[in-house]
């Protein structure tokens, strides 16, 4: 594939003149005309990737794409014709497990009646075994049986629940204001920690020679355990500034499963308190250090942001609180227009959280190096493996927003991305290689440059985002489920019966951004 970047700064005439000088103009005109027209068709570009000086990354928690945006207009959602919306294993009429019973996706209504349960649903099983059983060898039809193994009968069908615009209005407003990606996948068929390891290092070390394979979420996060190279090290070596801003508000619980830190402290390389990994990957606090750096024009070129767990949207924590977190993050950037106008903020979700998604992820063929746990590793000694060697990924689809003056307008990108795509974007912008990225994964995921609309003038004006605090009163009803749901014993949300097939909102097609032009 010819990169459009090859034509940067060169007119059509200059391109063909250069080709003619090599005696190949006639051949190249026929061969390259479609490429040239695509590269120049929009006319002069209003922006370029180099105009983005700050890339800010934030991963929220445990929501699939269909679960949040199956009803959004013009995306690959509930209007897509597929039998996969009819999942077997639960009978809505009898409200019981039934191998032949069919459950359709159903709305979890948070806007009327006793909505506390809907706002804070029980936490589904989303670890390595359950995710692979849901995927079911690529059939993508094991969602309900996978939950029945570990969850109560009444809480099994919550994986088929979804939210609509009235339930998560801020999320839908973000999709209408910026760029949403409807083919963004988690990196691994499993839970939080391994996916976040992909977010900073593009691997979980399946070969097991540097502290892995780490394929499940441990109760206590490993300290100074792993030794493989991570993206922050490559950035430091290249002279690119970076920080990981972690919430410190849980104190002694920051290194337990109740926290979601950046995991830099899990690597032996961070043992020296004078090292870049310790100074920039462990010490910075969110939000205070982040706010200070934005205001003082000292925001690094690359930032990983890790809010407090209760703000992460992880079930059974309230989705409305997560909306507050996202809006507050955007508002921090808006406090300094000079920073905002040259920043790209990417907000995605680390994994599907057990919630259904109808798009079967692309996975690597068995035995693909770096994408399966090899036979040289004793699989029975790999915590949480259940004897399953792979595939590692891609995982299921998750929501992803690209928020920037260069991604305004309710845009939609259909290119395939995963968490390593965020690292690939950093690599593309700053010329830094992504460590551990397998050839297979590099060949099937993009670098996210196509999510930007560089052909249009940037729009740095403050977006019209209603602050979601008005959604918070209903959160008080969540208190019992916040505790019980995180322990997998939450009050169930009753599946409505009779069921109806969900539909997407009506509306025009969403424009596709230009990417690099």
Curated annotation (Swiss-Prot):
Induction: Expression is induced in vitro in the presence of phosphatidylcholine. Also induced upon infection of THP-1 macrophages.
Activity at various pH: Optimum pH is 7.
EC assignment: 3.1.4.3
Top-tier EC class: hydrolase
Keyword Electron transport: no
One GO BP: symbiont-mediated disruption of host cellular anatomical structure
Reaction catalyzed: a 1,2-diacyl-sn-glycero-3-phosphocholine + H2O = phosphocholine + a 1,2-diacyl-sn-glycerol + H(+); 1,2-dihexadecanoyl-sn-glycero-3-phosphocholine + H2O = 1,2-dihexadecanoyl-sn-glycerol + phosphocholine + H(+)
Temperature characteristics of this protein: Optimum temperature is 37 degrees Celsius.
Cellular component per GO, a single term: extracellular region
Gene3D superfamilies named in the record: Alkaline Phosphatase, subunit A (3.40.720.10)
Keywords, comma-separated and alphabetical: Cell wall, Hydrolase, Secreted, Signal, Virulence
Biological role stated in the UniProt entry: Involved in virulence. Induces cytotoxic effects on mouse macrophage cell lines, via direct or indirect enzymatic hydrolysis of cell membrane phospholipids. Hydrolyzes phosphatidylcholine. Does not have hemolytic activity.
Other comment: Polymorphism was discovered in the phospholipase plcA/B/C region.
Record protein name field: Phospholipase C C
Species of provenance: Mycobacterium tuberculosis (strain ATCC 25618 / H37Rv)
């Amino acid at each position: 594939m010819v990169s459009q970047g090859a034509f940067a700064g060169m007119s059509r005439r200059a391109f063909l003149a250069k080709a003619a000088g090599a005696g190949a103009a006639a051949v190249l005109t026929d061969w390259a005309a479609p490429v040239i027209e695509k590269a120049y068709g929009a006319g002069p570009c209003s922006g370029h990737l180099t105009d983005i000086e700050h890339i800010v990354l934030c991963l929220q928690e445990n929501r699939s794409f269909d679960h949040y945006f199956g009803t959004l207009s013009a995306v690959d959602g509930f209007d897509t014709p597929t039998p996969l919306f009819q999942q077997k294993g639960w009978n809505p009429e009898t409200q019981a497990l039934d191998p032949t019973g069919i459950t359709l996706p159903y709305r979890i209504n948070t806007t009327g009646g006793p909505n506390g349960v809907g706002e804070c649903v029980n936490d589904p099983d989303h670890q390595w075994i359950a995710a692979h059983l849901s995927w079911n060898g690529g059939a993508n039809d094991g969602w309900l049986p996978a939950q029945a193994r570990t969850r109560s009968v009444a809480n099994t069908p919550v994986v088929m629940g979804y939210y609509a615009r009235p339930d998560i209005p801020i999320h839908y407003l973000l999709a209408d204001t910026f760029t949403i990606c409807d083919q963004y996948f988690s990196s691994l068929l499993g839970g939080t920690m391994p996916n976040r390891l992909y977010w900073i290092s593009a691997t979980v070390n399946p070969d097991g020679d540097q502290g892995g394979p780490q394929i499940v979420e441990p109760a206590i996060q490993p300290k100074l355990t792993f030794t493989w190279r991570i993206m922050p090290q490559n950035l430091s070596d290249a002279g690119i500034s970076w920080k990981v801003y972690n919430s410190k508000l849980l104190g002694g619980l920051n290194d337990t499963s109740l926290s979601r830190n950046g995991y830099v402290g899990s690597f032996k390389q961070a043992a020296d308190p004078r090292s870049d990994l310790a100074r920039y990957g462990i010490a910075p606090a969110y939000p205070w250090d982040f706010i200070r750096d934005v205001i003082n024009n000292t925001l690094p070129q690359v930032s990983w942001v890790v809010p407090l767990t209760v703000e992460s949207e992880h079930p059974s924590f309230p989705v409305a609180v997560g909306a507050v977190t996202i809006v507050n993050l955007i508002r921090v950037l808006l406090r300094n227009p000079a920073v905002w106008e040259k920043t790209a903020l990417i907000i995605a979700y680390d994994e599907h959280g057990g919630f259904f998604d109808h798009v079967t992820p692309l996975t690597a063929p068995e035995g693909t190096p770096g994408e399966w746990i090899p036979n040289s590793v004793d699989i029975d000694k790999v915590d949480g493996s259940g004897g399953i060697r792979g595939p590692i990924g891609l995982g299921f689809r998750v929501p992803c927003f690209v928020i920037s003056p260069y991604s305004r307008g309710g845009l939609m990108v259909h290119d395939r991305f995963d968490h390593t795509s965020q690292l690939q974007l950093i690599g593309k912008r700053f010329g830094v290689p992504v460590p551990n990225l397998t050839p297979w994964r590099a060949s099937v995921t993009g670098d996210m440059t196509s999510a930007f609309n560089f052909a249009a003038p940037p729009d740095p004006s403050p977006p019209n985002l209603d602050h979601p605090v008005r959604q918070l009163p209903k959160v008080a009803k969540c208190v019992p489920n916040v505790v019980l749901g995180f322990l997998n014993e939450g009050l169930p949300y009753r599946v409505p019966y009779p069921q109806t097939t969900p539909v997407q909102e009506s509306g025009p097609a969403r424009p596709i951004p230009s990417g690099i032009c």
